[in-house]
Amino acid sequence: MKEGIHPNYREVVFQDMSSDFSFITRSTIQTKDTIVKDGKEYPLAKIEVSSESHPFYTGTQKIMDTAGRVEKFRQKFGNKLGKAAK
């Protein structure tokens, strides 16, 4: 293999921001954040959904509005529901 053309493959901590679940795996992701886990410093990749918080894996239905989409929809359309929706 050629030297210097491949990304750095290293151990990274992925942290689920909705459930505070984290796991260590190997990745080439580039991050500026770091975290100390098990006495060692790792790069930190923040994710919104993992197997610990996804409804398919947990079996529970949960509304996750991380980007404010529901409020944006309500501001745009308000309570203008049709007769069929009531």
Curated annotation (Swiss-Prot):
> Short name of one Pfam family for this protein?
Ribosomal_L31
Membrane-spanning residues where?
A: none
Q: Which keywords are on file for this protein?
A: Ribonucleoprotein, Ribosomal protein
Q: Name one GO biological process term.
A: translation
Note the SUPFAM superfamilies from the entry: L28p-like
* Keyword match tRNA-binding: no
Q: Which InterPro entries match?
A: Ribosomal_bL28/bL31-like_sf, Ribosomal_bL31, Ribosomal_bL31_B, Ribosomal_bL31_sf
Q: Does the keyword Amino-acid biosynthesis apply?
A: no
Can you supply one Gene Ontology CC term for this chain's record? ribosome
Give GO MF terms, alphabetically. Answer: structural constituent of ribosome
Family, similarity comment: Belongs to the bacterial ribosomal protein bL31 family. Type B subfamily.
State how it assembles. Part of the 50S ribosomal subunit.
- Name under which the protein is recorded: Large ribosomal subunit protein bL31B
Organism per entry: Cupriavidus taiwanensis (strain DSM 17343 / BCRC 17206 / CCUG 44338 / CIP 107171 / LMG 19424 / R1) (Ralstonia taiwanensis (strain LMG 19424))
